[in-house]
């Protein structure tokens, strides 16, 4: 019976050990394991949220970069249009100024030509009168001379 009492004593000691472990050791171990499981789950969820946030941030950055490029392209196109408009305006203004200068120069040339013709007509008339006086060798009075010059100028 000795063996039976030993087994019974060991069984009682084992039951006491299991009860002690169930009461004092098992709850802190389970709490630590559950806490660690929760931390791991929270870490995984946080990593997933961070990945989603990163994807959203990358998509947003890509959209903003595309928008910035589009805006830059629009600004460049507007600048090119403005440059072309300024060049066209400058060309038109230069053309108008050239036409104005050419018109003024032409008017001055025409006026100078007219003045030179009048001067030449007067000189030709004076030479004709002087030649006529010498040929006729007589003196023509001033009124007749003026009348002859006027007729000669009108004919020229």
UniProtKB/Swiss-Prot annotation:
Membrane topology: Single-pass membrane protein
Disulphide bridges: none
InterPro entries referenced in this protein's UniProt entry, alphabetically: ATP_synth_B-like_membr_sf (IPR028987), ATP_synth_b/b'su_bac/chlpt (IPR002146), ATP_synth_F0_bsu_bac (IPR005864), ATP_synthase_B_chain (IPR050059)
One Gene Ontology term, aspect cellular component: plasma membrane
Subcellular location(s) of the protein: Cell inner membrane
Domain of life: Bacteria
Main subcellular location of this protein, as a coarse class: membrane
SUPFAM superfamilies found in the cross-reference section: F1F0 ATP synthase subunit B, membrane domain
Entry keyword annotation includes 4Fe-4S: no
Listed GO MF terms: proton-transporting ATP synthase activity, rotational mechanism; proton-transporting ATPase activity, rotational mechanism
Any Pfam family: ATP-synt_B
Parts of the chain that traverse the membrane: 11-31
Keywords from the UniProt entry: ATP synthesis, Cell inner membrane, Cell membrane, CF(0), Hydrogen ion transport, Ion transport, Membrane, Transmembrane, Transmembrane helix, Transport
Coiled-coil annotated residue ranges, if any: none
HAMAP family associated with the record: ATP_synth_b_bprime
Subunit structure: F-type ATPases have 2 components, F(1) - the catalytic core - and F(0) - the membrane proton channel. F(1) has five subunits: alpha(3), beta(3), gamma(1), delta(1), epsilon(1). F(0) has three main subunits: a(1), b(2) and c(10-14). The alpha and beta chains form an alternating ring which encloses part of the gamma chain. F(1) is attached to F(0) by a central stalk formed by the gamma and epsilon chains, while a peripheral stalk is formed by the delta and b chains.
Function per UniProt: F(1)F(0) ATP synthase produces ATP from ADP in the presence of a proton or sodium gradient. F-type ATPases consist of two structural domains, F(1) containing the extramembraneous catalytic core and F(0) containing the membrane proton channel, linked together by a central stalk and a peripheral stalk. During catalysis, ATP synthesis in the catalytic domain of F(1) is coupled via a rotary mechanism of the central stalk subunits to proton translocation.
Family: Belongs to the ATPase B chain family.
Name the record gives this protein: ATP synthase subunit b
Species in which this protein is naturally found: Erwinia tasmaniensis (strain DSM 17950 / CFBP 7177 / CIP 109463 / NCPPB 4357 / Et1/99)
């Amino acid at each position: 019976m000795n063996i039976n009492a030993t087994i019974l004593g060991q069984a009682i000691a084992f039951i006491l050990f299991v009860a002690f472990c169930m009461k004092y050791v098992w709850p802190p171990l389970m709490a630590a394991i559950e806490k660690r499981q929760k931390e791991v789950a929270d870490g995984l969820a946080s990593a997933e949220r961070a990945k989603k946030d990163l994807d959203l941030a990358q998509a947003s950055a890509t959209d903003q970069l595309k928008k910035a490029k589009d805006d830059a392209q629009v600004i460049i196109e507007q600048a090119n249009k403005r440059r072309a408009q300024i060049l066209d305006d400058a060309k038109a203004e230069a053309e108008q100024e050239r036409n104005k200068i050419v018109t003024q120069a032409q008017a001055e040339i025409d006026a100078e030509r007219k003045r030179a013709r009048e001067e030449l007509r007067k000189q030709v008339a004076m030479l004709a009168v002087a030649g006529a006086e010498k040929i006729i060798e007589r003196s023509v009075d001033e009124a007749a001379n003026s009348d002859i010059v006027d007729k000669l100028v009108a004919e020229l």
